[in-house]
Amino acid sequence: MVKTQRVVITPGEPAGIGPDLIVQLAQREWPVELVVCADATLLTDRAAMLGLPLTLRPYSPNSPAQPQTAGTLTLLPVALRESVTVGQLAVENGHYVVETLARACDGCLNGEFAALITGPVHKGVINDAGIPFTGHTEFFEERSQAKKVVMMLATEELRVALATTHLPLRDIADAITPALLHEVIAILHHDLRTKFGIAEPRILVCGLNPHAGEGGHMGTEEIDTIIPVLNELREQGMKLNGPLPADTLFQPKYLDNADAVLAMYHDQGLPVLKYQGFGRGVNITLGLPFIRTSVDHGTALELAGRGKADVGSFITALNLAIKMIVNTQ
């Protein structure tokens, strides 16, 4: 790495395990400076609850970034709206969570930070606070004014991107248009090259219907939409294999010769990945003008403050972000 970079982290829901995981991250050295966008008392109280050392250093944007030493974090302060009781949601803190996301996103957009790693949020409490919120992916897409973003989850062995994300099943077929597929595949191909350092990405594409439509007998979306788009993109030089039945595609004979899978909808691709690598998976938002990774689990309110939260996914998310920073330099 040419110079030390700053990575901004949001802990997510303050009553959940996010703050626990941040404190655990701080127990090791990192080659980047970790800037945590959070309430100071929240972090120090959680560290005391876990019996772990933590020193918070003030964020100084005009000073050179320094590698993070064990037991320390750099703090970019955002104040809680309500005091936190571990494991109990407080509606007003939905505003606090969104403030941390907004500040972190803005810092990436203005060049303060080289990447953003997000902890788990509770979508329900944010909406209960009167803030329409469907997820990190959509929030960062809107705030960064990105034309289109793509959700991808990854482990060391498997990357799965989604053509559609948080849609009811009844709406998915109508959402999968030629324009959407062109855009999603272009973003996936571009970011595999630029952020993952893969010179010629090989992408497996799932069909939408059982048996990938069985030649039109189980749905015609493959014939009408997916196959024509793949043929057009192959003519541009992209290495695309599909559409393949999802129950066939996730086998070593296909995956061993691919860099990523494109699933048509959320529950088509993610159950396989989460079964294969739960606790080690990372959520990545492709198409943003900055690097964003996230844990692949929820807030686990029942584990907060008990020292039982597994920091593995957060470590993987941070390590992947660091690799992506190197690839883009």
From Swiss-Prot:
InterPro entries: PdxA, PdxA_fam. Keywords: Cobalt, Cytoplasm, Magnesium, Metal-binding, NAD, NADP, Oxidoreductase, Pyridoxine biosynthesis, Zinc. Its cofactor is Zn(2+); Mg(2+); Co(2+). Binds 1 divalent metal cation per subunit. Can use ions such as Zn(2+), Mg(2+) or Co(2+). A divalent metal cation binds at H166, H211, H266. Pathway: Cofactor biosynthesis; pyridoxine 5'-phosphate biosynthesis; pyridoxine 5'-phosphate from D-erythrose 4-phosphate: step 4/5. One of its GO terms (cellular component) is cytoplasm. One of its GO terms (molecular function) is cobalt ion binding. NCBIfam families: pdxA. The active site is located at the dimer interface. Homodimer. This is 4-hydroxythreonine-4-phosphate dehydrogenase. It comes from Escherichia coli O6:H1 (strain CFT073 / ATCC 700928 / UPEC).
